[in-house]
Amino acid sequence: MNKIISKKQFSEKVFCIEVEAPLIARSCRAGNFIIVRVDKNSERVPYTIAKADPEKGTLTMVIQEVGRSSTKLCDLKVGDEVADIVGPLGTPSHIENYGTVVCAGGGIGIAAILPILTALKKAGNRVISVLAGRTKELVIMVDDVKEYSDEVIIMTDDGSYLSLIHISEPT
């Protein structure tokens, strides 16, 4: 069983859930994913690992409620447990120092690019991140992205968020 450590609601149907999974947290890499089963009667559903914290032994997922399984997971509270988590699965992304890279994501897709842009920055790249969403509220994890980006561009369909954030001056 894997206990839910924290839960944050980004919008009406989008949640950020952090769960205990120490073995997976220590061995996952950018591009890996997990399969979660909420209870013994639930289906197995794949989710992107948005963040892994090897020291805390936790994984963070961003889930959008769209069906029975995702709703069941999003209905859980801090302290509740999921039946099992399998992973890390998939082939990790190839990461090296390319020089300058651009990472783009929109809506909950921002969670999918976060581990990749983090790994690219740690490999010595200059990272430019482009984030988008229908509204300002749907542009998620901005602070997490800023932490590993040299420049962040944020846009929305409705114009409620249009900015260029220079994290550090280019060298």
Can you annotate each of these PLM segments?
Residues 165-171:
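Residue-level detector of conserved catalytic or cofactor/ligand-binding positions
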Residues 82, 97-102, 111:
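Extended interfacial segments that mediate partner engagement and assembly in macromolecular machines
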Residues 1-78:
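Ferredoxin-reductase
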Residues 127-134, 154-156:
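Short internal beta-strands
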Residues 39, 87-88:
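Short, surface-exposed secondary-structure boundary micro-motifs
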Residues 112-121:
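Histidine-anchored nucleotide/phosphate-binding helix
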Residues 128, 141, 145-147:
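Helix-rich terminal scaffold detector
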Residues 34, 82-85:
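Generic structural signal for buried aliphatic residues
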